[in-house]
């Protein structure tokens, strides 16, 4: 809901365009870049799993993509907004529903949710929950994790005026708001970047 609200506000001021990005349209322009009618000092790539799986035209090294799955369950009684964490998480969403996850796999990226991982998560619910439940949803996704488990934030090591904001695996994703604010402050006020997160560290 928050993202929808922010997106709507940006659209009102014509600061947001929803379209498929084409790297071939990006041009060097003076000390910055140009994309169609838009000009900027730099462009920030936030392509997530698309980069992690090598499906972006912008080559970014250092990823170790991880597949994860979650299920949504309907419980016999309400968990409220509580969270149970014992190997997997179980987060109450209100209305007798909860989200349970997440699994880890380093293959099967092209496949959807698997029966094996669904069973793993349902077994977990039976272990931590004293009551009946029914699975009502099952999803799979790709974490754009990085080999050293730190995000990739900073200038691209080879492409001028191209920056990277990626690598939010299962741990770094919790810090995404802080990391985004950190990058904004660098552009606005010149505050130093986090050296341990620079993409250049992954280039040998």
What spans do the regions from the language model cover?
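Short, hydrophobic alpha-helical segments
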Residues: 14, 38-39, 129, 183-191
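Helical element adjacent to the flavin cofactor pocket in flavoenzyme catalytic cores
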Residues: 1-42, 46
């Amino acid at each position: 809901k928050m993202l929808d609200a922010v997106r709507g506000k940006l659209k009102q001021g014509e600061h947001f365009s929803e379209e498929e990005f084409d790297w071939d349209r990006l041009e060097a322009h003076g000390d910055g870049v140009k994309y169609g009618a838009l000009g900027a000092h730099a462009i920030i790539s936030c392509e997530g799993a698309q980069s992690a799986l090598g499906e972006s035209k912008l080559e970014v090294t250092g990823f170790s993509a991880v597949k994860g799955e979650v299920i949504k369950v309907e419980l016999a009684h309400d968990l409220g907004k509580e969270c149970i964490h014992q190997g997997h998480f179980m987060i109450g969403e209100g209305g007798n529903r909860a989200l349970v996850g997440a699994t880890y796999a380093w293959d099967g990226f092209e496949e959807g949710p698997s029966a094996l991982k669904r069973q793993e998560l349902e077994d977990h619910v039976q272990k931590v929950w004293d009551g009946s439940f029914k699975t009502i949803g099952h999803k799979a996704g790709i974490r754009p994790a990085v080999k050293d488990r730190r995000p990739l934030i900073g200038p691209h090591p080879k492409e001028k005026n191209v920056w990277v904001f990626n690598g939010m695996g299962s741990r770094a994703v919790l810090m995404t708001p802080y990391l985004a604010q950190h990058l904004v402050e660098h552009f606005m006020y010149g505050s130093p970047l986090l050296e341990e997160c620079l993409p250049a560290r992954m280039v040998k």
